[in-house]
Amino acid sequence: MPRTRGPNAASRELEEAHERLAKKDEEIGQLRARLAQRDASRRGSGIEPENIVWIFCSGRTGSSWLSRMMGELEGHTVWFEPWVGALVDPYHLQLDRRKGAHFILSSQYRATWLASIRSLVLDGADARFPETGSKDYLIIKEPGGSVGAPLLMEALPESRMIFLIRDPRDVVASWADAHKKGSWLSADEGPEASAERARRAASRYVRNIGQAKRAYDAHRGRKALIKYEDLREDALGTMKRSYSQLGVTVDEGELSRAVEKHSWENIPEEDKGEGKFYRKATPGGWREDLTPEQVEIVEHIVAPLLKEFYPESQPNVGG
């Protein structure tokens, strides 16, 4: 017969559990106090968390163009692809499966490692951009690291964010061109490899954009959603609207000059075209660039995102 615990033993276990929880709450409170003290001590001498503007997106969505326009403005500095978000990639780390206390990102120690992520970003920024003042803005262009966007925004909730999106079919078409023989990424591939690359590119897009959207939806601070297609149609108007949503005041004349300087029309012709980094900049160009097989593959993988952000674009699957 299994022995049953008496009421005294059960009471002691419950009391011990309460003590452990109280101790954990005390540790978290102390950690938050240290974090606040740390931020207070660095205030006025480095980049302020609320002056960080993240650009979360996927590759080939126009983030280089956007960040260069923003970088032209007074008091703006661009941190070009630090990949810090890749360090907390939920897919690679299997965050939904690893629950043990010994796991470095265990939920039991969330406050501890969020503080570490925060310090990594702020200290890394201060070390790289010591000339950037407390009133200046740091634009962090983070396409590859967008997979870690939710945790980055949780660690730095005061920061602002731009969610940059582009039709995934155009994104895949751009990557397909980049990997052709003689192109700027110089990779030769046959028809089978081309189909597989489309599948991988679409899956990568879903991971990065999906996590960026998750961060955008959860963020309660200043944020802006920018579509690449809107930038191409009216870059100045889109930039004005986005800065207003971000709560950042900029000089309209300076902004207009930045937009003009980095317009598609002002890129030298020899730097544009197929096989070049600046390839096409034509929304909907995927209709000419992708094979029917590639289109079907991509539209199947990205269907929910297409439905939400490009509902006017009817999938070509089966047609």
Regions found by a protein language model. Give the residues of each.
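PAPS-dependent sulfotransferase catalytic core
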Residues: R3-G124
